[in-house]
Every structure is written in C-alpha cells, then in structure tokens.
C-alpha cells in the first residue's frame, strides 16, 4: 500500500473509463447539439449577410440607375429651358421688328399727310396771294 499521488490499483482504470465515458456523454448530449446550434446560427448569419450584400448591391445598382435617369431628366430640362428661351428671344425679336415696321409705316404715313397738308397750305397760300394781288391790282387799276 502506497500513499503516493497515484496508486495503481483498480480505481485508476475505473476513473479513466469514467472520464472517457463522461467525455463521450458530454459530446453526445451537450457539445454536439451546441455545435449544431452554433453551426446553424453561423449558416443563418452567413445567409443573412449574403442577402444583405445582395440587397446592398441591388440598392447601389438602383441608385446608379436613378442617378442616370435624374441626370438625363436634368439635361432634358436644361435643353427645354434653352429651347423656350430661344423661342422667347425669337418671338421678342419678331415682335420688335413688327413694331418697328409699324412705327416706320406710321411715320411714313404721317410724313405723307404732312406733305399733303403742306402742299395744300402752299396752294391755299398761293391762291390767297393771287387773290390779294388781283384785289390790289384791281384797286390800283381803279384809281
């Protein structure tokens, strides 16, 4: 009988067997199910990460498409504004030309009327001068 740390009697193999049996039982009852749950959780996390990455890629693609469409819409709006401004400028120039033509026409008509009135006044004046001259001449002749 030895009182050392390790006694090689029947208890040592039984304890070894108990450790092996307990390890096997823990593996079957506790570790394997926990590893299964952990593996399922990791798989679920991986799937969710993949889904999130796919959705992020889709969102980025949609964002790019919307930005492209927005840029095209802005370009169309700028072009339309330019066209409207050009049309307004052309319309304004046309109206200005038309107004100038009307003013020129009115001026010419007024000048013609003034010329006619001048000619009429000169004729009346000439007639009156002739009448006065005839009157004076007739008075002078009577004397």
UniProtKB/Swiss-Prot annotation:
Record CDD domains: ATP-synt_Fo_b (cd06503)
Cellular component GO terms, alphabetical: chloroplast thylakoid membrane; proton-transporting ATP synthase complex
Keywords (A to Z) from UniProt: ATP synthesis, CF(0), Chloroplast, Hydrogen ion transport, Ion transport, Membrane, Plastid, Thylakoid, Transmembrane, Transmembrane helix, Transport
Pfam families with a match to the protein in the record: ATP-synt_B
Domain of life, per lineage: Eukaryota
Membrane spanning residue stretches: 12-31
UniProt key word Transferase: no
Membrane topology: Single-pass membrane protein
GO MF: proton-transporting ATP synthase activity, rotational mechanism; proton-transporting ATPase activity, rotational mechanism
Localization annotation: Plastid, Chloroplast thylakoid membrane
Function: F(1)F(0) ATP synthase produces ATP from ADP in the presence of a proton or sodium gradient. F-type ATPases consist of two structural domains, F(1) containing the extramembraneous catalytic core and F(0) containing the membrane proton channel, linked together by a central stalk and a peripheral stalk. During catalysis, ATP synthesis in the catalytic domain of F(1) is coupled via a rotary mechanism of the central stalk subunits to proton translocation.
Additional remark text: In plastids the F-type ATPase is also known as CF(1)CF(0).
PANTHER family given in the database record: ATP SYNTHASE SUBUNIT B', CHLOROPLASTIC
Database matches in HAMAP family: ATP_synth_b_bprime (MF_01398), ATP_synth_bprime (MF_01399)
Description of how the protein assembles with itself and partners: F-type ATPases have 2 components, F(1) - the catalytic core - and F(0) - the membrane proton channel. F(1) has five subunits: alpha(3), beta(3), gamma(1), delta(1), epsilon(1). F(0) has four main subunits: a(1), b(1), b'(1) and c(10-14). The alpha and beta chains form an alternating ring which encloses part of the gamma chain. F(1) is attached to F(0) by a central stalk formed by the gamma and epsilon chains, while a peripheral stalk is formed by the delta, b and b' chains.
Protein name in the entry: ATP synthase subunit b', chloroplastic
Taxonomic source organism: Cyanidioschyzon merolae (strain NIES-3377 / 10D) (Unicellular red alga)
Gene: atpF2
């Amino acid at each position: 009988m030895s009182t050392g740390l390790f006694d090689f009697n029947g208890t040592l193999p039984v304890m070894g067997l108990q450790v092996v049996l307990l390890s096997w039982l823990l593996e079957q009852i506790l570790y394997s199910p926990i590893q299964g749950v952990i593996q399922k959780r990791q798989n679920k996390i991986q799937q969710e990460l993949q889904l999130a990455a796919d959705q992020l890629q889709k969102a980025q693609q949609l964002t790019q498409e919307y930005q492209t469409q927005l840029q095209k819409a802005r370009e169309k709006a700028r072009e339309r504004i330019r066209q409207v401004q050009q049309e307004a400028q052309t319309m304004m120039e046309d109206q200005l030309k038309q107004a100038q033509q009307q003013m020129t026409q009115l001026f010419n008509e007024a000048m013609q009327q003034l010329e006619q009135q001048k000619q009429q006044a000169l004729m009346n004046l000439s007639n009156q001068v002739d009448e006065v001259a005839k009157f004076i001449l007739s008075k002078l002749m009577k004397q």
